[in-house]
Regions:
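Pseudouridine synthases involved in rRNA/tRNA modification
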Residues: 1-46, 209-216, 223-226, 236-303
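RNA pseudouridine synthases
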Residues: 1-199, 297-301
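Short histidine-centered loop motifs in beta-beta connectors
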Residues: 57, 226, 231-234
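Short, surface-exposed secondary-structure edge patches
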Residues: 62-66, 232, 269
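Short beta-strand or tight-loop elements
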Residues: 87, 135-136, 176, 187, ...
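Conserved hydrophobic positions within beta-strands
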Residues: 91, 180, 218-221, 254
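N-terminal low-complexity/disordered regulatory or targeting extensions
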Residues: 200-202, 277
Length: 303
């Protein structure tokens, strides 16, 4: 016999989270004590030990952590903040409007019909919904699957639209590092062309401005052993496969990039990493500046 009893709806009780702005350099414990003068130190220590304090979006238990005025400190009085742990994606910074991550190589930024899940987007979507099922994540820009490094996601439609509708003015600087085959004749220089994408989704250069989109890449040699060189690359424009095409045009393809002429893949990956991301925060208008380490293999193979 069917059970006709009406089941009670499952109701979500949001976390009680409070933010305590940092106005001057101070240690975390001192800041929390000053922000909650009616609370005993033992209570604050429990919050820290139970992952209920987050600094820049990440749970923090170090009571003597040095804080700066740009830091975001939040306390969850309901339960612990989720500890984000994913070997292919690292959260570098988080606030109410944006998340900056370091993506590992081999991970899609966003899925498609064939591979909708196990992407940077899906991982972060599940993460933000853990705190509140109504939370959302929005992709603002992408990195190629085989490119590692820094990228930013929006947590609100307002942040997404402000970044995307004014991208060239909001993004102040993007710097990549790459290992290329051989050694460029000039230690530094600029590659300029117009990029075209054909019906097979292949991108290539043309000198005809009527056929493609302007792409400008500036490069500088950091170190070289003649066989491989480590380059720093700065983008004046952001086109699909821009760096890969321009290094091919320079006759020094990126190591591991067999699609654009590389002979070998000694690092067993595309040797391209988004190292620096500097932009204007879409809501606070504060300048945000993030840098990541050059992958170790990039350094060793070019010595």
């Amino acid at each position: 016999m069917a059970n006709n009893r009406q089941q009670k709806p499952v109701r979500y009780a949001p976390d009680r989270i409070k933010e305590f702005p940092v106005n001057a350099p101070v240690k975390l414990m001192e800041h929390l004590s000053a922000s909650m003068p009616d609370r005993k130190r033992t209570f604050i220590k429990q919050l820290l030990s139970h992952n209920q304090v987050a600094v820049n979006g990440r749970p923090e238990s170090q009571f003597d952590l040095e804080l700066q005025p740009s830091d975001s400190v939040k306390v969850n009085f309901t339960h612990e903040f989720k500890v984000f742990n994913n070997r292919r994606l690292k959260i570098v910074y988080e606030d109410d409007d944006i998340i900056v991550v370091e993506k590992g190589y081999g991970l899609l930024s966003m899925g498609n019909d064939k591979k909708p899940d196990n992407t940077a987007y899906s991982i972060l979507r599940d993460y933000v919904k853990w705190t509140n099922p109504l939370n959302k994540i929005f992709i603002v820009h992408r990195l190629d699957r085989d490119t590692s490094g820094l990228m930013m996601f929006a947590k609100s439609m307002e942040a997404k639209e402000k970044m995307q509708h004014n991208w060239n003015n909001m993004v102040l600087n993007r710097v990549y590092v790459a290992v290329v085959e051989g050694e460029p004749a000039e230690k530094e220089g600029t590659v300029k062309s117009y990029l075209v994408e054909n019906s097979r989704y292949e991108v290539y250069s043309t000198d005809d401005p009527k056929k493609g989109q302007l792409a400008v890449t500036r490069y500088r040699t950091i170190q070289t052993n003649g066989k491989y060189s480590l380059l720093e690359l700065e983008l004046d424009t952001g086109r699909k496969n821009q760096i890969r095409v321009h290094m091919h045009d320079l006759d020094h393809p990126i190591s591991g990039d067999t699609k654009y002429g590389a002979e070998k893949s000694p690092l067993h990956r595309l040797a391209l990493h988004a190292k620096t991301l500097r932009f204007i925060h879409p809501i606070t208008r504060q300048i945000m500046d993030f840098s990541s380490r050059v992958p170790g293999g990039f350094m060793s193979i070019t010595r």
